[in-house]
């Protein structure tokens, strides 16, 4: 059911699907030999580039986390993110600093800049079959223009808001540099603490380690 729901959502946004599909497919022929050669040193990669995109989802973060969401407008975004792992404890947990540059399409056309610190859990019992991580990040977010969908949520919406993300990555041990990404991209004022309004974007993409 979860996979069918995601396919139904993303089938409505062919531009996002096209960009992410091309990004996923094109590098693989050149990457396989290099990745297989470096399989034992995957934990030594400290830099990560993530490309992801998806639609604006309603009604709130809680529903999006539970995949109980609806897509009610023609607003979606694509984001490129660069992260650096600055601390790791064995193969259990790591911390990263990440900067992002995003672009909106459809109903909105502004840009977005984000910066965050990420905590990532690395240890799962099935990792030798499907390498898996779960991450939570928090930081700040700036829109180059006030978002209309965030104004619909609250008339006092502004450019600066808190940024929060939840992310799952899945990959094959044979290709240690590459992972599939599902990321929830969330902006909010933390109940008015740093601003008003908010938005949620359930996104898919890929992550490349180097």
Predicted regions and their residues:
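A generic structural signal for short, solvent-exposed coil/turn residues
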Residues: 25, 41-43, 70-74, 89-91, ...
């Amino acid at each position: 059911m979860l996979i069918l729901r995601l396919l139904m959502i993303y089938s409505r946004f062919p531009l996002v699907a096209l960009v992410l599909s091309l990004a996923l497919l094109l590098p693989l022929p050149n990457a396989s030999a290099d990745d297989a050669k470096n399989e034992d040193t995957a934990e030594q990669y400290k830099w990560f580039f993530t490309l992801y995109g998806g639609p604006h989802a309603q009604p709130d973060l809680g529903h999006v986390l539970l995949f109980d969401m609806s897509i009610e407008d023609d607003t979606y975004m694509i984001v490129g993110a660069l992260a650096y792992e600055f601390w790791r404890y064995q193969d259990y947990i790591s911390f990263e600093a990440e900067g992002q540059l995003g672009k909106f399409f459809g109903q909105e056309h502004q840009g977005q800049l984000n910066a965050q610190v990420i905590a990532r859990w690395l240890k799962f019992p099935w990792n030798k079959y499907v390498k898996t991580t779960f991450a939570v990040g928090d930081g700040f977010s700036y829109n180059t223009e006030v978002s209309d969908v965030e104004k619909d949520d609250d008339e006092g919406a502004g450019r600066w808001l808190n940024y929060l993300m939840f992310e799952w990555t899945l990959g094959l041990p044979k290709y240690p540099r590459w992972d599939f990404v599902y990321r929830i991209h969330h902006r909010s004022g933390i109940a008015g603490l740093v601003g008003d309004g908010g938005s949620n974007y359930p996104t898919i993409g890929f992550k490349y380690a180097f």
